[in-house]
């Protein structure tokens, strides 16, 4: 009987340990959400709803920038869903980055007139196409080009 008890205990403990290892632990992060906040009531409603989320450590509401910042062990999708459940259906994750983080802030995809001061929209930087017209223009005025003087 001792061997059977040992084996059953071994396999049952191994099963529970593997379940515990599969469960992901949430990481500490800051979630920024853009949501239109009109009045004190809206601000209070959003703050109460978001602070009730399990794992939320701090909640800051900036009415001027239409921004809600949540710090803690939270899931961004869950925070967004909670803000939308308060009646703010147009809530979205913060689409802006600081002006200094973008190489070309006035590019067509990055510049946004509605962005708060000091911020531009998140966008991928445009990559140069191989064989683009820039290369052709550079070789047009090159010293190695025998027909360059005809253009000038």
UniProtKB/Swiss-Prot annotation:
Expressed in lateral roots and mature anthers. The keyword Cell inner membrane does not apply. Pfam families: HMA (PF00403). A lipid is attached at residue 149 (S-farnesyl cysteine). Residues 142-152 have a biased composition (Polar residues). It is found in: Membrane. One of its GO terms (cellular component) is membrane. A metal cation binds at residues 39, 42. Residues 150-152 form a propeptide. Residues 123-152 are annotated as: Disordered. Its main location: membrane. Disruption phenotype: No visible phenotype. Hipp20, hipp21 and hipp22 triple mutants are cadmium sensitive. InterPro entries: HMA_dom, HMA_dom_sf. Residues 28-91 form the HMA domain. Signal peptide: none annotated. GO terms for molecular function: metal ion binding. The keyword Lipoprotein applies. GO terms for biological process: detoxification of cadmium ion. Keywords: Cadmium, Lipoprotein, Membrane, Metal-binding, Methylation, Prenylation. Belongs to the HIPP family. PANTHER family: COPPER TRANSPORT PROTEIN ATOX1-RELATED (PTHR22814), HEAVY METAL-ASSOCIATED ISOPRENYLATED PLANT PROTEIN 22 (PTHR22814:SF293). Interacts with ZHD11/HB29. Heavy-metal-binding protein. Binds cadmium. May be involved in cadmium transport and play a role in cadmium detoxification. This is Heavy metal-associated isoprenylated plant protein 22. The gene is HIPP22.
